[in-house]
């Protein structure tokens, strides 16, 4: 396996092979960033098709050529965080090498590939794989690439940036992949997200669906081919971070959130009641609420516990104005990403409602909170479980990577004693699916969703929603799945 680190053309004259180690010996190379995007390309690739998709704030390291799965991680040794994207046959390669890599993995996304690359039900059918191998020549390679791209125009665009590896080398790679797949044990690596092209003619979409039943937390679908430059660019060089999208959409919903967020208000009241039941009766000196939003839960905390100091935090600076009626010498507001901010040490309670599901690295946040809390401190929060908005996920393939109550408590148990956990399912009824979409938009919970609607897609969505999720005549349902957890610092 080859690894190369790529730099923007204006800053470097070359890319580095893994043999150069962690230092930069090429004149004009920029300093290494703290984080890297590790991209496992598909069969027959090199770095050429992807050099124009450099991420804006991470180093890009590309893996390709799977004649061997020897994985030299020298280039990755200095990074504090690694984000993995794998495409096509690279998904299998990544699934094999990542479990034993000890890399600081932050996120993993698989695009149009599976951990089972040669499989009648979960990958490329063996007969097709063997046919591709046995008949491979320059002409059949171009036919394969045409099928990979899905259209003549996409194929012509790909030819301008196509890899230049010889056909014999590509044949050797296919032979090696087949041999290694038959010899190596199946990987148990679990991906954060799998993205499936519904017009993929290389890895059949149904096979991808079957393969990912136990090996990913979230499935996203799009209407496109196996090689889709737009999808690859979105994941290699995203235009806006998910946190920025979250902030933008909640900011737009400030005016309508208090009226529409009925479930979130119900959850806030229950969370406050649970705190009253399970926390000591004495008054709290220092409390931090992250993700305070428009202040629904904040006001309940103030009335119920009267803390000496309450620090409100939210990703959206604009939420300060929604909370201005309660801001004073005891209640302050700190804008920013709670995962990155430093909260005051010696805090007695760190709490939130309906926020943690948006976090990229909740386990790291739990560790940070344990360091911030005083010796008798508590972390208490509500979040959402795997059944949350299951209707939207089933119909669009989009949604957050929700964690179960068991997964959350297992993560917390290393540092905290679990005081109380519970979960419930809340079903809201609406007159029609359009009201569901309006409700989601008005509460801002579309968050990181990038669904684009055409008239035909919207009509199909509404028809399927009414067919599948109509509990009674004239209404449709939307599921919320809140989880409540209170834990004490050990």
UniProtKB/Swiss-Prot annotation:
GO terms for molecular function: carboxyl-O-methyltransferase activity; malonyl-CoA methyltransferase activity; S-adenosylmethionine-dependent methyltransferase activity. Keywords: Biotin biosynthesis, Methyltransferase, S-adenosyl-L-methionine, Transferase. Residues 1-248 are annotated as: Unknown. Pathway: Cofactor biosynthesis; biotin biosynthesis. The keyword Zinc does not apply. Converts the free carboxyl group of a malonyl-thioester to its methyl ester by transfer of a methyl group from S-adenosyl-L-methionine (SAM). It allows to synthesize pimeloyl-ACP via the fatty acid synthetic pathway. Belongs to the methyltransferase superfamily. NCBIfam families: BioC. This is Malonyl-[acyl-carrier protein] O-methyltransferase. It comes from Bacteroides fragilis (strain 638R).
């Amino acid at each position: 396996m080859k690894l190369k680190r790529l730099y923007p053309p204006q800053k470097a004259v070359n890319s580095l092979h893994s043999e150069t180690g962690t230092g930069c010996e090429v004149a004009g190379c920029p300093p290494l960033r703290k984080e890297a995007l590790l991209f496992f390309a598909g069969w027959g690739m090199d770095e050429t098709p992807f050099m124009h998709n450099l991420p804006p704030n991470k180093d890009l390291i590309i893996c390709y050529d799977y004649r061997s799965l020897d994985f030299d991680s020298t280039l990755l040794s200095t990074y504090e965080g690694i984000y993995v994207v794998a495409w096509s046959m690279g998904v299998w390669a990544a699934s094999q090498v990542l479990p034993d890599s000890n890399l600081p993995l932050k996120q993993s996304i698989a695009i149009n590939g599976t951990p089972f690359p040669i499989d009648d039900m979960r990958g490329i059918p063996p007969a097709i794989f063997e046919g591709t191998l046995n008949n491979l020549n320059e002409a059949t390679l171009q036919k394969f690439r045409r099928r990979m791209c899905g259209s003549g125009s996409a194929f012509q665009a790909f030819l301008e940036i196509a890899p230049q590896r010889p056909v014999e080398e590509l044949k050797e790679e296919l032979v090696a992949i087949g041999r290694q797949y038959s010899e190596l044990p199946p990987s148990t690596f679990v991906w954060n997200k799998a993205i499936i092209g519904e017009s993929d003619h290389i890895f059949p979409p149904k096979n991808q669906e079957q393969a990912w039943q136990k090996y990913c937390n979230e499935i996203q679908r799009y209407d496109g081919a196996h090689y889709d430059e737009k999808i690859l660019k979105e994941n290699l060089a995203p235009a806006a971070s998910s946190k920025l999208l979250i902030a933008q959409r909640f900011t737009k919903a400030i005016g309508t959130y208090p009226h529409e967020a009925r479930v979130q208000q119900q959850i806030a009241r229950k969370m406050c009641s649970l705190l009253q039941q399970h926390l000591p009766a004495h008054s709290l000196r220092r409390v931090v609420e992250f993700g305070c939003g428009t202040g629904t839960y904040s006001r309940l905390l103030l009335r119920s516990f009267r803390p000496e100091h309450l620090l409100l935090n939210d990703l959206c600076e604009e939420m300060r104005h929604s909370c201005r009626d309660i801001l004073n010498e005891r209640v302050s507001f700190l804008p920013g990403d709670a995962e990155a901010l430093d909260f005051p040490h010696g805090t007695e309670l760190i709490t939130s409602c309906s926020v943690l599901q948006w976090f990229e690295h909740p386990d790291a946040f739990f560790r940070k909170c344990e360091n911030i809390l005083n010796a008798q401190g508590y972390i208490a929060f509500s979040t959402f479980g795997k059944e949350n908005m299951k209707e939207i996920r089933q119909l669009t393939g989009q949604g957050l990577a929700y964690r179960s109550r068991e997964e959350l408590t297992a993560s917390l148990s290393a540092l905290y004693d679990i005081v109380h956990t519970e979960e419930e399912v809340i079903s809201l009824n609406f007159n029609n699916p359009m009201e569901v979409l309006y409700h989601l938009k008005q509460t801002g919970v579309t968050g990181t969703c990038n669904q684009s609607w055409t008239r035909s897609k919207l009509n199909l969505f509404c028809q399927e929603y009414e067919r599948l999720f109509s509990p009674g005549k004239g209404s449709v349902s939307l599921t919320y799945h809140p989880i409540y957890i209170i834990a004490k610092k050990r």
